[in-house]
Amino acid sequence: MKHDSTIDANEVAFYSRLADTWWDREGPFWPLHQLNELRTAYIIDKLCRHFDRDATSDRPLSSLRVLDVGCGGGILAESLAGFGARVTAIDVVEKNIRVASLHAAQQNLDIDYRVETASALADAGEKFDVVLNMEVVEHVADFAAFMQDCCRLVADTGVMFVATINRNPLSWLFAIVGAEYVLRWLPRGTHRWDWFRTPAETTEQLSKGGLSVVSRAGVAANPFNRRLRITKSMKVNYMLFASRS
């Protein structure tokens, strides 16, 4: 894999150490397992509306080409493959891809896993109906370049989902102090506050890449029961749904 300005070596090393714990629902990635049910429902709803699909069918995403960027252990990729999507999933951490590939095989799911960057796929001219940019933005070294690479991967009638963390005092308090040090929901060092991006910054990059935001939502966590819910407030975690058309 050639040098890419969006890759941070410390991030790669951090997730390499945790790779074997992706599918441990009580391990360090338990928040992602909690979040996955919520975000999958959000994604399915938006895709069915955009592509005029029957949300009540068993495989509402059948034939849609979906790219999961920064797929980790494949938690979201497996969910969407189960709904019929043709999923390609990429990550720069080789151990993540090995873990994800093995787990998908055990579940009899056909997912195209690759150790690859968004930039390399875009340079190769690949296009997808759906690009998933979920919980990745806050881990890349070059935000603008990464976002434009992802935008290049969206087909003419395609869409992109972005989920990340806002940058303000509240997000520092909740996403870093609270989640990593007080509640210890996440390993210390998971996030860097200066790499968080505001909704305005993310929207600007989407616009530069030819995409328009059509839906916004926040995600809130209950510290007492560890449950997550969709909310209107985007003060901390937020999701954007953007369309090329």
Report the location of each language-model feature.
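N-terminal, positively charged/glycine-rich alpha-helical extensions of SAM-dependent methyltransferases
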Residues: 1-29
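Conserved short-loop catalytic and cofactor-binding motifs
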Residues: 3, 27-31, 134, 190-193
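Conserved alpha-helix/loop element of class I SAM-dependent methyltransferases that forms part
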Residues: 34-62
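Rossmann-fold NAD(P)-dependent oxidoreductase module
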Residues: 46, 79, 205
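Conserved SAM-binding loop
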Residues: 54-59, 64-170, 199, 240-242
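S-adenosyl-L-methionine-dependent methyltransferase catalytic module, highlighting the catalytic core
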Residues: 95, 103, 107, 141-245
